[in-house]
Amino acid sequence: MDTVSLAWAALMVVFTFSLSLVVWGRSGL
């Protein structure tokens, strides 16, 4: 696994986490 794919994987994880965090915050959890 090269550095570029690893960086993309990390970016997707962070993006998904922050997006779900925003959704949870908006729904009043």
UniProtKB/Swiss-Prot annotation:
Statement: the UniProt record of this protein carries the keyword Plastid: yes
GO biological process: cytochrome complex assembly; photosynthesis
Keywords, ordered alphabetically: Chloroplast, Electron transport, Membrane, Photosynthesis, Plastid, Thylakoid, Transmembrane, Transmembrane helix, Transport
Membrane topology value: Single-pass membrane protein
One Pfam family of this chain: PetN
Subcellular localization(s) per the UniProt record: Plastid, Chloroplast thylakoid membrane
Annotated GO CC locations: chloroplast thylakoid membrane; cytochrome b6f complex
Protein name stated in the entry: Cytochrome b6-f complex subunit 8
HAMAP family with a match to the protein in the record: Cytb6_f_PetN (MF_00395)
Family that this chain belongs to: Belongs to the PetN family.
Function: Component of the cytochrome b6-f complex, which mediates electron transfer between photosystem II (PSII) and photosystem I (PSI), cyclic electron flow around PSI, and state transitions.
GO MF term (any one): electron transporter, transferring electrons within cytochrome b6/f complex of photosystem II activity
Subunit and partners: The 4 large subunits of the cytochrome b6-f complex are cytochrome b6, subunit IV (17 kDa polypeptide, PetD), cytochrome f and the Rieske protein, while the 4 small subunits are PetG, PetL, PetM and PetN. The complex functions as a dimer.
InterPro entries: Cytochr_b6-f_cplx_su8_sf, Cytochrome_b6-f_cplx_su8
Transmembrane segments: 3-23
